[in-house]
Amino acid sequence: MKNKTWLIVAFVFAAVMLLAAVLYPKLTEKYSAGSTPDNTNSDTVIQADDFTVYDSEMNGVNLSDYFGKPIIINFWASWCGPCKSELPAFNNLYEKYKDDVVFLMINLTDGQRDTVSSIKKFVSNNGYSFPVYYDLEYDASDTYGVYSIPETVFIHADGSLYDIRVGAMNEAVLENYIKRMIGGEEK
């Protein structure tokens, strides 16, 4: 009886593994490098909600101040490993596309793990040239319901939402988003 039970368990396990091996490539292809999700209805337009963050001089800055160009908002923190892993890609693409796209690199400044002075030092030490904005009052992160970082919000030049992506992105995926946004291509 034990041998029969063991044989059934082994057969079920083998069947599950075979099914997983067959389905895995299909289920993950939409997340491969260079791809962007195609899960929104292009007939539905959702306007991006406005918020206020602070620049390096502690001047209040509104999202709506930047409508007119495509906008990429990245919510991040210096203690977040996945955030730190994607910052070099953001910096490279900021240098390449800064005339065509607005980059709002928004630090979730909690006053403890991340302070304005510690983030200025972090950015300087890493040689990043992108502008950093500080979400001191959590207006931006609350507005967009940020509960997990990194989170990146893509906004069309007219102020309508293009996409929201949670999790770190590699440079190829991020650049694909940028090219689609500045090329006027709809998802």
Residue ranges of predicted features:
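Hydrophobic beta-strand anchors of alpha/beta hydrolase catalytic cores
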Residues: 72-73, 103, 152
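A short beta-strand-turn-helix
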Residues: 50-71, 95
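Thiol-based oxidoreductase modules, predominantly thioredoxin-like and allied folds used
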Residues: 101-114, 129-137
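Conserved helix-turn-beta segment immediately C-terminal to the redox Cys motif
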Residues: 69, 87-107, 124, 171, ...
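Thiol-/selenol-based redox modules, centered on thioredoxin-like
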Residues: 154-187
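N-terminal targeting signals for export/organelle localization
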Residues: 1-48, 187
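Short, internal strand/loop/helix patches
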Residues: 120-157
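Conserved redox-active cysteine motifs that mediate thiol-disulfide chemistry
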Residues: 67, 75-92
